[in-house]
Amino acid sequence: MAETLSGLGDASAAGAAAVSSAASETGTRRLSDLRVIDLRAELKKRNLDSSGNKSVLMERLKKAIEDEGGNPDEIEVTSECNKKMPKRPSKGRKPEDEGVEDNGLEENSGDGQEDVETSLENLQDMDMMDISVLDEADIDNGSVADCVEEEEEATLPEGLADSTELVEGDLKGLPEQLQEHAIDDKDTVNNVDTSSSDFTMLQEMEEASLEPENEKILDILGETCKSEPVKEEGSELEQPFAQATSSVGPDRKLAEEEDLFESCGHPEEEEEEEEEDQEEEQEEEGDLALASSSKSESPSTRCQWSEADAPLAVVKREPADAPGGGTGMDREPVGLEEPVEQSSTAAQLPEATSQELVRAPTAALSPEPQDSKEDVKKFAFDACNDVPAPPKESSASEGADQKMSSVEEDSDTKRLSREEKGRSSCGRNFWVSGLSSTTRATDLKNLFSRYGKVVGAKVVTNARSPGARCYGFVTMSTAEEATKCISHLHKTELHGKMISVEKAKSEPTGKRVPDRRDGDSKKEKASTSDRSANLKREEKGERKDDAKKTDDGSTEKSKDADDQKPGPSERSRTTKSGSRGTERTVVMDKSKGVPVISVKTSGSKERASKSQDRKSASREKRSVVSFDKVKESRKSRDSESRRERERSEREQRLQAQWEREERERLEIARERLAFHRHRLERERMERERLERERMHVEQERRREQERIHREREELRRQQELRYEQERRPAVRRPYEVDGRRDDAYWPEAKRAALDDRYHSDFSRQDRFHDFDHRDRGRYPNHSVDRREGSRSMMGDREGQHYPERHGGPERHGRDSRDGWGYGSNKRLSEGRGLPPPPRRDWGEHGRRLEDDRAWQGTADGGMMERDHKRWQGGERSMSGHSGPGHMMNRGGMSGRGSFAPGGASRGHVIPRGGMQAGFGGQSRGSRPSDARFTRRY
C-alpha cells in the first residue's frame, strides 16, 4: 500500500490543479464546472448523443437531468482516470496515447459497482485488436522471467492463435528436469509462447467461433508464465502415434497411406484427422510414462536446439543469459530463416506432424526401408508439386533408431506433465476493472503478490475508443492462487476506487497491443509460430547429428532426392545450409522393437516448408506414399497435362477457325452493306435530281402563271382605261348649240361666225398642245369666240365713237377684215347691218393672243362648262340692261369711260369687270369698248 499511496501522491501532485478532487473519488459538482470529458461521460451514461462543443453538451445534459428530476447544479461525478497520470510510456504505448486514454475515462461513472461489472462484461467482449497496454510490471524472479518477456513481447505483431498447437508441441517436447539447462533460451521460448497465448486470447475475442480451439490452446499456454521450457513437438506427437500404429499393423498403415494420398489436396480433412489424432494421443497419455527411462539423454539435446532457436524467436529482445547457455554452442542454428518464409504455415505444423507421424510407421516397416523412403520423400514433392514439400520425411537410418527412441520417450513424458500444467493454467488469469487512473502494473503486482506468485500484470485500455476505462490483466502462477486473489480482492478498494476482480473467460495470459495493423499481426503471428517450429525441427536435426554419424551414404542419397524435388528453390538452398548427415532418421520403439516413426529432420527443409500456407500439413502425411504411387500420380499428371494441352490446342484451333469464319462472314456482310449503301446513295442522288427538276418545272410554271396574270392585269387595265375614256365624254356636259341659238342675245349668225372664225386659217393647234384635238369638234371653245366677237363689236363701237382715234369706220373695218380674216365681222355686219369692227393694231392683237393662251391653260376639265355658264349669265345680264346709260356703263367697265358718272352705273361695271378679269387678266380693262353696241340695245 505504500507504493499505492506514493503513486497516488505523485498523481495528485502532478494534476491537483486540473482535477477538483482525487481522480478516483466521487463528488458533487456544478454543471458549469464539468469538463467536456465529464459532460460526455454523463451523456454516454444516459445513452445520449455526446457529440458537439461544450455549450451543446451542457445544454443536453442539463435537459436530461431536469427530465430525470435532478438538480443540474449538483451532479455526482466520478472521475476514473486522472489527466495527469505520472506513468512512464510503457511498451506498446506511445506518449500521445496517455491523452487518448484520459479522454472519456470518467464515463460510466454513475454508481461504481454496477459500472465495474458492466465494464467487465464489456471487457470480455472487447475486440482484442483494440486493447492497448498502458503499463506492465517487470517481474524478475526466475519462475516469472518468461512472463516478463511475454508482456514485453506485446509489442510483437499479433496472430499466433493458429499456431497454438505447434506451441503445445514445443512445450511438451522436453522433460521438466531440463529447466536448469533451458534457462538460456527461456526468453525465446516464452516470447513464442506468450505471444501465441496472447494472440490466442485475441483471436478468441475477435472470433467467438474459435472458442473451443482456444480453450484447448489455453491448456497449452498455461505454462507460459511458469517458465516451462519449450518441448519438442515432433517427439511429443511421435510416441502416442508410435504405440498406436505399432499395435495396428501393416494393413491399417496401407489404408492410411491411401487415405493420405487421397487427401493430398484437402487441408480441411487433414485438420479433422489431426484433431482426432490429438484425442487419441490424450487417451494414450497413460502409456507414455514408460518412456521416462531415457531422460538422461535429453538435456544436451534440449540445450542444443534451444540455443539454436534463441536468435530465431526473439524479435525485439536479446536472448536472456542463462546458466546452461554454453552447452550447445558448437551447433549451427540452422533454424534461422526469413520471416516471409515462415509467415504462413506455422499453424499447420502440429497438424502436419501428427498426421504424418500416424502414417510414418508404414514406411518404416516396409521391406525396403531406404529406397522406399527416398521415393516417399520424392513423392512428397513430386506428387503434389503445386504445394511445398513436407517438413518431415522417412529415413532409412536403422542405426539411429535406438538413440532417437529415447528422445521420443522423454518428449512424451514432458508432454504429459505440460498438459497437466496446461489444464491447471486455465484459471490463472483474471481481469481487474474499476482501476484508478493512477494505478500502475507494479501496484497490481504488489497487491496480488500477497496471495501468491504474480507471473504477469498489465494495465490495458481500449485504444480504439478514446477515454475508455483502464483494466488490469494479471496472471498468477497457479489457478489456486488466482482463485484466492479473486476471493480476497474482489470488491475491495485500491487507490480510492472499488475494483472488481473476475476470472478471464477461457483466455490465456496477457493482453495484446493493438498498435499494429491486422495484416502485420497475421504476418508476425505466423512468423513467431514458425520460429517455435524451427526450434523443434532444429532440435531434431541436431539430435540426428549426434545419433547418426554412420548414416552418411543414405543421407547423401536422400539429399540428392531432395535436391531434385520440384519444391521451392529456397527449400533446397536451406537444406544444404544444414548439416548434410542429418536429413532423415528412423525412430525405433525399444519396448516393442518395431520402427515406430520416420522423421525428416533437415532444419532447412523444415524452414522452407514453413513459408507455405496450411496446405503443408497434407504434404507431411504424404511422405509415406509408395514410389509406385508417385510414378502413377506423375503419369496421371502427365497424361492429364497432355490432355489439357491437347484440349487447349483443340480449343485454340476451333477458336481460330471460328474467328476466321466470323471474319469472312463479317467481310461478306460488310461488302453487302457497302453495296446497299452505294445503291441507296444512287437512289438518293436520283431522287435529288428528280426533285431538282420538279422544282425547276414548278418555278417555270409559276413564272408562266405570273406572266399570264400580269398580261391579264394589263389587258384589264387597258380595258378599264378605254372604258373610262369612253365614259368620260358622257359625263362632261356638251355644248348646247340649240339652247344658245335660242338665246336672244346670241343669234345664230354670231355662233356660226364665231365657229367659222375659230376654225379659220389661223391655226391654233400648235399653240395649245394640252388640248385633246379629238374632243374639239365635240365642244368648241365658244367662250373665246364670244370674247373675240365682243371685242370686235366693242372695237366697232369704239371706232364709231372715236373716229379720230380709229380713223373712221371704213378704215377700221377694212383693217380688221384684212388682219383677222375670220369672216365673222363680215357675217355679223351682213346679218345685222352692223358697221365693220374698228381696226385693231397688232399690239392689241398680241395682247389678246396672250390672254387667250392664258385662258386656254385654265380651260381644261370642267372649267369650260363653268365658263359657259358665266358667259351665259353675263350675256343675260347684259341683255337685261337696256337704255342709254349702258353705253357709259360698258365704257366704264372697260376702263376707258372715265367720264361716265359713277352712281348707280357702277353696279353694272362690277360683273363685267369681274368677267373680264376671270378670262383675260388685267390687260382687258385697257381694251376699247365698242361703241357700236349702243345701237343694239
Swiss-Prot record:
Region (Disordered), start-end ranges: 1-35, 64-117, 222-429, 499-661, 684-738, 771-937
Covalent link (Glycyl lysine isopeptide (Lys-Gly) (interchain with G-Cter in SUMO2)) residue numbers: K172, K186, K403, K414, K505, K536, K565, K592, K600, K869
Domain named SAP: residues: 31-65
Composition bias, Basic and acidic residues: 225-234, 370-380, 412-423, 499-573, 581-592, 603-661, 771-818, 838-854, 863-873, 927-937
Keyword DNA-binding: yes
Covalent cross-link Glycyl lysine isopeptide (Lys-Gly) (interchain with G-Cter in SUMO1) as placed by the record, residue numbers: K600
Keywords, sorted A to Z: Acetylation, Coiled coil, DNA-binding, Isopeptide bond, Methylation, Nucleus, Phosphoprotein, Repressor, RNA-binding, Transcription, Transcription regulation, Ubl conjugation
Compositional bias segments (type: Low complexity): 11-24
Modified residues (Phosphothreonine): T188
Residue(s) carrying N6-acetyllysine: K629
PROSITE patterns, A to Z: RRM, SAP
Free-text description of this protein's post-translational modifications in UniProt: Sumoylated by PIAS1 with SUMO1 and SUMO2/3, desumoylated by SENP1. Sumoylation is required for transcriptional repressor activity.
Asymmetric dimethylarginine found at: R890, R896, R906, R912
List of residues that carry Omega-N-methylarginine: R832
UniProt superkingdom: Eukaryota
Interaction with POLR2A: annotated segments: 550-814
Location of cross-link Glycyl lysine isopeptide (Lys-Gly) (interchain with G-Cter in SUMO): K231, K316
Region Interaction with SAFB2, annotated ranges: 621-937
Compartment(s) where it occurs, according to its Swiss-Prot or TrEMBL record: Nucleus
Ranges of Acidic residues composition bias in the record: 67-77, 98-117, 268-287
Residues bearing the modification N-acetylalanine: A2
Quaternary structure and interacting proteins, as annotated: Monomer and homodimer. Forms heterodimers with SAFB2. Interacts with KHDRBS3. Interacts with CLK2. Interacts with POLR2A, ASF/SRSF1, SRp30c/SRFS9 and TRA2B/SFRS10. Interacts with SRPK1 and inhibits its activity. Interacts with RBMX. Interacts with FUS. Interacts with ZBED4.
Its job: Binds to scaffold/matrix attachment region (S/MAR) DNA and forms a molecular assembly point to allow the formation of a 'transcriptosomal' complex (consisting of SR proteins and RNA polymerase II) coupling transcription and RNA processing. Functions as an estrogen receptor corepressor and can also bind to the HSP27 promoter and decrease its transcription. Thereby acts as a negative regulator of cell proliferation. When associated with RBMX, binds to and stimulates transcription from the SREBF1 promoter.
This protein's name: Scaffold attachment factor B1
Lineage: Eukaryota, Metazoa, Chordata, Craniata, Vertebrata
Encoding gene per record: Safb
